[in-house]
UniProtKB/Swiss-Prot annotation:
Record keywords: ATP-binding, Kinase, Nucleotide biosynthesis, Nucleotide-binding, Transferase
Positions annotated to bind ATP: 11-18
Positions of transmembrane segments: none
Reactions the enzyme catalyzes: dTMP + ATP = dTDP + ADP
Protein family according to the UniProt entry: Belongs to the thymidylate kinase family.
Physiological role: Phosphorylation of dTMP to form dTDP in both de novo and salvage pathways of dTTP synthesis.
HAMAP family given in the database record: Thymidylate_kinase
UniProt cross-references to InterPro entries, sorted A to Z: P-loop_NTPase, Thymidylate_kin-like_dom, Thymidylate_kinase
Protein name as it appears in the record: Thymidylate kinase
Pfam family of the protein (one): Thymidylate_kin
Gene Ontology terms describing biological process: dTDP biosynthetic process; dTTP biosynthetic process; dUDP biosynthetic process
GO molecular function: ATP binding; dTMP kinase activity
Length: 212
């Protein structure tokens, strides 16, 4: 059986990832492709429990940055073993809201953790598995934060970070995209939803043609 494809959507807070994950899933399903939609951190019951620890906006004690990093990869290891790898093995396509690029951007760029440590954990947990395509939704931090404010809901622990943190996250994402241009497609998310999704559809069409 031909293994499935692994597509990830990345970007900072407020760029429209969740909306466009749904769009990608619907677009692929309409073409007869079995799709598994998932997210990180999370994606399985145990990984979702770790997600709660990571996103809790009012924890009983501060979360150490190294502990945060290890929890991210603990959730990822479980997610890969219980959901992502089995889906790919049976030929399904996995569409994931964030993956390891987010760890390099948030814990590496935002927190300033040593990227060689992140890469070591990546190698241990993923054993060479990488997305086939990463759609990076990019827009100025100030505009993205205004979108988050308009939601009118309680912010999680990451959403409460300041602008400097998110500028570092954005810079890290763009640097990773520049390092892996064949895997990444950078999408200007500071446009209408219709324009953003037209760009996404164009990239998906191009990749499907190259993969067939």
């Amino acid at each position: 059986m031909t293994p499935g494809r692994f597509i990830t959507l990345e970007g900072g807070e407020g760029v429209g990832k969740s909306t466009n994950v749904a769009f990608v899933c619907d677009w692929l399903s309409a073409r007869g492709i079995e799709v598994v939609r998932t997210r990180e951190p999370g994606g399985t019951p145990r990984a979702e429990a770790i997600r709660e620890l990571l996103l809790d906006p009012a924890p009983q004690e501060p979360l150490d940055e190294t502990a945060e990093l290890l929890l991210m990869f603990a959730a990822r290891a479980q997610h890969l073993a219980a959901r992502i790898r089995p889906a790919l093995a049976r030929g399904a396509w996995v569409v994931c809201d964030r993956f390891t690029d987010a760890t390099f951007a948030y814990q590496g760029g935002g927190r300033g953790l040593d990227e060689t440590r992140i890469a070591t954990l990546e190698a241990l947990v993923q054993q060479g598995l990488q997305p086939d395509l990463t759609l990076l939704l990019d827009m100025p931090v100030e505009a993205a934060q205004r979108r988050v404010e308009r939601r009118g809901i309680e912010r999680d622990r990451f959403e409460r970070e300041r602008g400097a943190f998110f500028n570092a996250v954005r810079e890290s994402y763009l640097a990773r995209a520049a390092q892996a241009p064949t895997r990444f497609a950078v999408i200007d998310a500071d446009r209408s939803l219709e324009a953003v999704q037209a760009s996404i559809a164009a990239h998906l069409t191009e990749r499907l043609a190259s993969w067939s």
